[in-house]
């Protein structure tokens, strides 16, 4: 199976319903990776056009950039954890991608802390 990925940066804020620093809105400089996979390449030898992939990811990230995640409808009733952020970006980006078999989004909250969400795409 072929895999193609790209990364973009996202700055956003969040808070949790807990006492202490995590309970106050605080920023994160996230690194977001979109990865797609499939068995077939097109006539150009591409799994996916990187420009189309970048447009899908940048469109999703653009809706979150500089925002307090808790205040967005995508996180209504959902804690803005890095896990839920990965799933939210996945849902927002996959609908804008050309047909692919599988996709995942990984969100890094620091150099060594990350969460990922991925799934097969129904065609």
Please identify what each model-predicted range represents.
Residues 1-123:
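Charge-rich, low-complexity N-terminal segments
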């Amino acid at each position: 199976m072929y895999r193609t990925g790209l990364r973009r940066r996202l700055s956003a804020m969040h808070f949790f319903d807990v006492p202490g620093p995590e309970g106050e809105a605080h920023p994160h400089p996230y690194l977001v990776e979109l990865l797609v996979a499939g068995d077939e390449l097109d006539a150009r030898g591409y799994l996916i056009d990187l420009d189309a992939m970048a447009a899908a990811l940048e469109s999703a990230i653009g809706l979150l950039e500089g925002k307090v995640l808790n205040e967005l409808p995508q996180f209504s009733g959902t804690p803005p954890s890095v896990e839920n952020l990965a799933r939210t970006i996945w849902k927002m980006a996959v609908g804008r991608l050309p047909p692919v078999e599988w996709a995942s989004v990984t969100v890094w909250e620091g150099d060594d802390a990350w969460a990922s969400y991925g799934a097969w795409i129904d065609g």
